Amino acid sequence: MSLEGRVFAIAGAGGLLGPTVVQRLASKGARLALAGRDKAPLDAIAAEAGGADTVSVDLLDAEATRAWARGIVERHGRVDGLVHLVGGWWPSAPIEDASLEDWRRFHDLLISTYQHTTQAFVPHLLASGRGRVMIVSPGHAQAPTHRNASYAAAKAAAEAWTLALADRFRGTGATANIVVVGAIVTPAMRTESPDKDYATFTPAEEIAQAIAYLCSDDAASMNGQRVTLRGAA
């Protein structure tokens, strides 16, 4: 399952999953372009993976996001995939007390950034002939509780956007898929808390493995799928 010579953009690469996903794709021979709010952690992740392009981008700025996509194509001549790892969570009030401000924050973080990145990259992914789009989504996007209504609604909207992308890609050679996970455990978390029971968590390594598979030609027939990993509710 080689990704040799292919170019992948990773949005939100400085977050929880970034280091593991970057390492996995780099190990398969991919050329990577990393974006996030802060460049310093991206530079560290890139160095650990043997090199990658890094840039600080405000993904809420649609034009800045398009400029990032254009820059990748100018540098590498192509872009073959977008892995959207932008995420975040904070506690919410019960549904009757949930504020519109809470919803707006989740919408900006989880929907607007995703809309901007996909709209910036879709023309290039179609030109690739085998473009890929992936997001990571929690199981409870499809089974929300009253205390995470705004978060779950935003994630469900991101899933719907992905399925709409899959429809756009039908018959083009490009694909869009969703990796469904539970609470995530990273190698760093295991090092920091080695005695904690992570049996019900989704390992970051398995998420990265699923993403690498979906990036490959082996997954060319998978489009509009929810790939559920262990730990997903």
Regions found by a protein language model. Name each.
Residues F106, L126, R132-G171, A183:
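Catalytic loop of short-chain dehydrogenase/reductase
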Residues G171, I178-V179, D195-A233:
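C-terminal helical subdomain
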Residues E48-E63:
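Rossmann-fold cofactor-recognition segment
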Residues G14-G15:
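Conserved glycine-rich cofactor-binding loop
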Residues R66, G87-R104, R147-S150, R190:
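Conserved mid-core segment of classical short-chain dehydrogenase/reductases
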Residues R6, R78-D80, L125-G139, G171-T175, ...:
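Active-site loop of short-chain dehydrogenase/reductase
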